[in-house]
Amino acid sequence: MARKEIIDEITMKRAITRITYEIIERNKELDKLVLIGIKTRGVYLAKRIQERLQQLEGLEIPFGELDTRPFRDDKQAQEDTTEIDIDITGKDVILVDDVLYTGRTIRAAIDGIVKLGRPARVQLAVLVDRGHRELPIRADYVGKNIPTGRDEEIIVQMSEHDGNDSILIKRED
């Protein structure tokens, strides 16, 4: 299995900054926003977007962590580790994840969100969209579109979890 770095730390930081600017441009009422990171790396990505929003707009955007395992149709959950202490009813929720692939994680995340309240709308921000959707899911904010083969895997590394920032592609030999 060969691994190759396709995005370095600087390019990754720029992609996150671009996503943040797009969120600002497309949302007139930033005070209605709630960021919800999908565990695990989506949480770190959402925190970085939250920090950039604070730097750029001076707003402290509410933040939560969503565990999609209890809502998956293909995986068994040990326990729900969701941490969302915010009333999302009437809010503009931005779900944040590292990679969008089949759409199944996002479907599970939406199921989790509607159990918590009735947001005004739900948007999706992803660092990488690699294609191959199995469900009609589309990201509103995309850092990088990286078309892949089904025999390839995108690996997002984030310093908070992996010790460095990069995006790798792993190919089966």
From Swiss-Prot:
- Name recorded for this polypeptide: Pyrimidine operon regulatory protein
User: What's this protein's family per the entry?
Assistant: Belongs to the purine/pyrimidine phosphoribosyltransferase family. PyrR subfamily.
This protein's source sits in the domain of life called Bacteria
Per the record's keyword annotation, is RNA-binding included, yes or no? yes
Q: What does this protein do?
A: Regulates transcriptional attenuation of the pyrimidine nucleotide (pyr) operon in response to exogenous pyrimidines, probably by binding to specific sites on pyr mRNA. This probably disrupts an antiterminator hairpin in the RNA and favors formation of a downstream transcription terminator, leading to a reduced expression of downstream genes.
Keyword field: RNA-binding, Transcription, Transcription regulation, Transcription termination
Q: Does the keyword RNA-binding apply?
A: yes
As one GO molecular function, the record gives: uracil phosphoribosyltransferase activity
**Where along the chain is substrate bound?**
T40, R41, D97, D98, V99, L100, Y101, T102, G103, R104, T105, R130
Instruction: Name its GO BP terms in alphabetical order.
Output: DNA-templated transcription termination
Ranges spanned by the short sequence motif PRPP-binding, renumbered to the chain: 93-105
Q: Name one Pfam family in it.
A: Pribosyltran
Source organism per UniProt? Lactococcus lactis subsp. lactis (strain IL1403) (Streptococcus lactis)
